[in-house]
């Protein structure tokens, strides 16, 4: 009767007054969103302190690395054992995880007691007891003969140094086993098992209960990257970027951080938020001054907080008509379970009455209403404080990922969260208010931390298996010193074949004479025109070469486009268009009608018969002008100049871009006798002794040989080094079977090799969770510029993920690490192969000259060499390693092949003038 009467009167004016009275009295416990955001800001600062190497020792929030580097992706499978030790009872579990299209977890477990004499005895006794219980469990399941992986949940303060190494800092929860503090608990279990000798296990991971919660929920929801426990105690963990964890080496990937957030405020950070009741609870606790945040929010203290408030308000004659009872004055008499019961929507007021009577009080209706309101304020503050710190964690993850809107899941366990009727809802609402730009899902952990320990173990096993499978594949792309020496030897053989008259025709490496017989000596001078034609745009340049004190090169140039109808029209139309552009340039430079020597960079396959005669073998790069193939391009140009009858030009030299690069660098460095291009394509040239150039008469002097080394291997001599990925790229190219070396080293193909490897990994479930997107199937999406960006040292994995997202590939942090590794392996092999080819060239020059040591410079151009962050360094190291008797310098060409054509012309004019004198 009294209960129904109380419920009916709940909202009477009297009750409202009582609620207002409590609200006024507990004003400092009711936290505004503004205050919560300030607490959140402070907590973010504390997190940073805990992560920093210099600030960590004094940080209150310790931010401990757990060495758990990945959350479940749903493909885990296998049979695992788990030990869950955190109190007077401990559990042993067998966890079977299956992945046959349907994720399923089966668990069997048994609870074992730890007698008090063992808890307080020696460490040897304790771990022998644990090993005995483990043996008993395995006997029952008849699995003793199996060596199963085991995960160990050990919920005591530990210093963790590896996933399977954790040193106990101090016992808590009534444990006093001697000889354990300061020791590695994994080692102690292993030794106890060895002492028995009747079974063996593989201890893979030791974790705390918070990490176990995150991993348990992470199996069901792959967005889960935060673990939260609000029970007797409180703690949280989350996945942090490795680059921010100063205590652990390495910058790539993520690691779970055990925050130990209960200690937030131990340094005084929360003094203005803590109330007199919080201070009283702390003073009466077993660890005064420690775990101050935990004492404001966790189940161990919530009931006691309510009791202290009731006592204080009764003393102030605001409750119970100023009367107290011995029971109410007894510490611990008001439990957190009582708070949950009183806040129950259905019969909370009735429960308040019963609990207050149990405490020896004679409560009036308004006393019950006031007690209900006190419980509400205390539990709401707890949820709000939790929300403030969670908001800081979510904000940090969002910042780490650089996302405008974060989608994340929080795995939660603990009696307060699960059993209090309103705590969870209040927590959820507060989090969403404090971080409105985060879509947060809360997922209850139903299977406790034992399953979590098994999940950590399952993930570690999956990662190890996948790593082994990937490494086996990537091994085929990693070249040993011996293999690279063999590539160098084979290149030298192919060079000899190309130089010899007898074998030249069948040789893939053509070693074409360029009729360039000297490099610049610095005495060149004069004004020269240069044409640079190699694509849909071409350049006309005026190059002024000065010698003496004013030695240098001054350049003016203009870029002209070639319309598609001209590219596909007649040869006459094409060369008339080129001459029209030259005329325009001369007029633009105020040099109309002037006759100048001209150098012509013509980057199409040609057979050169003299410095100023080059027969076009075939058009490439989209050109189809009729009447040109099989013709001398210099003659075609001269005929077009004659047709115009406006000016005359002395076409002195026609060269390709590689020779142009060598000559450009040769002007800066007289030791430059080799040219190399590693860009979209790849080629090399060098100064060969005339006696070895059998295709050209004469024994004296030297001539630059255009190697056309991209075709190295077209005769099958590299087949043992080519992988299935190289073969796939070749077969789908425009010229299958041709330019095989180029397809292993040049920018046009490296991205395709990477894409093929990524497809292979994804099909085998080693990447992108086994899901192949349509975008990944698209040829050419993986441009080489992305390789350069992905491998950039200053680029965080976050930016790597952004690049992959731009390519339409949704990746996890682990995926990004794998993609980066594939890019590294492919680019490194390219640089090493390039270095092996270059080592063959410089060693040949040294041997030609009969020198013990050669000092030589290589002029280099090309986007891959210039823009890739590591290509040049790896190539240089390889050349040094494979050609130790050569002192090789590398000089980047800054002005392209047009300047090179002008310098060849300048050298030819110098030699011609010297001959005339």
UniProtKB/Swiss-Prot annotation:
Keyword set, alphabetical order: Acetylation, Allosteric enzyme, ATP-binding, Cytoplasm, Glycolysis, Kinase, Membrane, Mitochondrion, Mitochondrion outer membrane, Nucleotide-binding, Repeat, Transferase
Involved pathway(s): Carbohydrate metabolism; hexose metabolism; Carbohydrate degradation; glycolysis; D-glyceraldehyde 3-phosphate and glycerone phosphate from D-glucose: step 1/4
Coiled coil: none
Residues engaged in binding ATP 2: 532-537, 680, 747-748, 784-788, 863-867
GO molecular function, one term: fructokinase activity
Start and end residues of each stretch annotated as Hexokinase large subdomain 1: 208-447
Keyword Membrane part of the UniProt annotation: yes
UniProt domain Hexokinase: residue ranges: 16-458, 464-906
Pfam families: Hexokinase_1, Hexokinase_2
Positions annotated to bind D-glucose 6-phosphate 1: 84-88, 209, 232, 413-415, 449
Residues given in the record as D-glucose 1 binding sites: 155-156, 172-173, 208-209, 235, 260, 291-294
EC identifiers of the protein: 2.7.1.1
InterPro entries xrefs: ATPase_NBD, Hexokinase, Hexokinase_BS, Hexokinase_C, Hexokinase_N
Domain notes: The N- and C-terminal halves of the protein contain a hexokinase domain. In contrast to hexokinase-1 and -3 (HK1 and HK3, respectively), both hexokinase domains display catalytic activity. The region connecting the two hexokinase domains is required for the catalytic activity of the N-terminal hexokinase domain. The N-terminal half regulates stability of the whole enzyme.
Oligomer status and interactors: Monomer. Interacts with TIGAR; the interaction increases hexokinase activity in a hypoxia- and HIF1A-dependent manner.
Name this polypeptide is given: Hexokinase-2
Native species: Mus musculus
Taxonomic lineage: Eukaryota, Metazoa, Chordata, Craniata, Vertebrata
